[in-house]
């Protein structure tokens, strides 16, 4: 067990913190530490496997466009851009620079629902 893990383990054990709460605290700490490390250097995505990459809104655009095609509910460029802008607004409201992929996916789902793209939303959730 490394030093940091031991410190955290002892703290959680000594304070009788529920394992589910531990998982949430560790996930939040990971995001907050990375956010501090990157500071104001743009926006970053924390991938599922732990890597960090520069945020690219074009990836969201292409994901939504491909999903709409797969759903048989083709969205035009303007429609997709509206969803992307909704996602960016949600990200900016958080006031940090590192976003886990699952959080960005949730924002896309919320934007699709809010804008009335139910069929695209269902397909997006299943991808």
Residue spans for each PLM region:
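Long, C-terminal-biased catalytic regions of enzyme "large/alpha" subunits
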Residues: 1-127
């Amino acid at each position: 067990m490394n030093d940091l893990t031991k410190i955290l383990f002892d703290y959680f054990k000594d304070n009788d913190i529920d394992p589910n709460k531990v998982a949430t605290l560790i996930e939040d700490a990971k995001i907050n530490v990375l956010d501090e490390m990157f500071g104001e250097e743009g926006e970053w995505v924390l991938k599922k496997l732990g890597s960090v990459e520069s945020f690219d809104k074009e990836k969201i655009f292409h994901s939504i466009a491909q999903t709409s095609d797969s759903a048989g509910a083709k969205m035009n460029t303007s429609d997709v851009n509206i969803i992307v802008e909704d996602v960016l607004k949600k990200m900016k409201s958080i006031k940090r620079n590192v976003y886990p992929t699952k959080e960005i996916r949730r924002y896309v789902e919320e934007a699709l629902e809010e804008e009335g793209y139910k069929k695209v939303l269902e397909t997006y959730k299943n991808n």
